[in-house]
A protein has these predicted regions:
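Noncatalytic, basic helical substrate-engagement surface that gates or grips nucleic-acid strands
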Residues: 2-12, 17-156, 165, 170-184, ...
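Non-catalytic nucleic-acid-binding/docking modules located in mid-to-C-terminal regions
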Residues: 2-10, 18-22, 69-79, 94-106, ...
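AAA+ P-loop ATPase catalytic core
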Residues: 159
């Protein structure tokens, strides 16, 4: 007699593992992956600074290999858009990025149009993947809103090296995969890490500490004292606005409501459809991804099965 359900076929522990795999959402921080593979591409092949074909190979190789590794039921590829809402809160937000780009060996004036076009080509060819962005939102915002509002009961794996996303690990159904070190991120106390970052600031995003010259050690002391007691202490009232500013900039719980609603609507209305082999082949051919085209039969069924 053929056994017809999980209860008859597998142990309780195995059933749980299977159900988790069937409800696993893989969420890529698209810009994080793009820049990580871009600098690797230029380092390994400095001549790839005009058409960026080697970068395209590294990007897609990382993307597809990670999908195969985690075998998800759904894939989200989230990207930033220009003019983040955070600039209205703090005009110096990420002001250090342009300086870094100007010093970089990458020709960003040539890269950005290629990147924008490449994103649209992925969206067109890989029609079972949610390629998401929303005006004035960063990829972090898209990831955070979906994890908090749409993926509360699924097993979510966030693919990024960005430590800002550690706060999402407060919820036990969220994991973060570090593609550089090829391992799941270990974060013992994500809530405390978030509180420390709000107090000490984030140099990578040009967000200053709430009090000048306050690093992690100083932030630890403030937390031990109690943030409310610290801010109410005589002479410290001036730091309250800085604290409130940093909370809004860093804590995903302060993403504007209208932005969150827009992200959710964009996800819910996204036109997922069956993959057309001709579009996939055209994508691989146009972007000189010959080896991937040859291997499509190996990983293609998994990509086609996404929903």
């Amino acid at each position: 007699m053929i056994k017809s359900n999980l209860t008859e076929l597998f142990s309780v522990e195995d059933q749980q593992k299977i159900e988790e795999e069937q409800n696993r959402v893989l969420i890529f921080d698209g810009h994080n992956m793009a820049y990580r593979t871009l600098f690797s591409a230029i380092f390994m092949n400095p001549e790839d600074n005009e058409k960026f074909f080697f970068w395209r190979h590294l990007f897609m190789n990382s993307f597809l290999n990670t999908i195969v590794k985690f075998n998800p039921s759904k894939v989200i590829l989230a990207f930033d858009t220009k003019g983040s809402w955070r600039y209205k809160i703090f005009s110096e937000y990420k002001s250090n990025r342009k300086v870094a780009r100007d010093k970089a060996v990458v020709d960003f004036e040539k890269f950005f149009p290629v990147f924008e076009s490449f994103r649209e080509e992925i969206k067109e060819a890989f029609s079972t993947v949610y390629v998401l962005e929303y005006p004035h939102a960063e990829a972090d915002d898209v990831i955070a809103v979906l994890c908090k509002e749409k993926f509360k009961t699924t097993q979510n794996v966030i693919v990024s090296t960005d430590k800002d996303l550690h706060q999402l690990l407060i919820e036990k159904n969220n994991q973060q995969f570090d593609p550089i070190n090829n391992k799941i991120v270990t974060c013992i106390n994500p809530k405390r890490e978030l509180d420390l970052k709000i107090i000490s600031g984030d140099k990578s995003d040009a967000i200053p500490a709430i009090k000048p010259r306050t690093g992690i050690a100083g932030a630890e002391g403030i937390l031990k004292q109690g943030i409310e007691d610290f801010l109410e202490e005589e002479g410290n009232e001036q730091y309250k606005d800085n604290y409130l500013r940093n909370r809004v900039l860093i804590d995903f719980n302060f993403i504007p409501k209208d932005l969150a609603e827009g992200i959710i609507n964009t996800y819910c209305e996204y036109p997922i459809g069956e993959i057309e082999s001709s579009k996939i082949m055209n994508f691989f051919t146009k972007n000189r991804l010959t080896k991937m085209m040859e291997e499509w039969q190996n990983f293609g069924p998994l990509i086609k099965s996404l929903k």
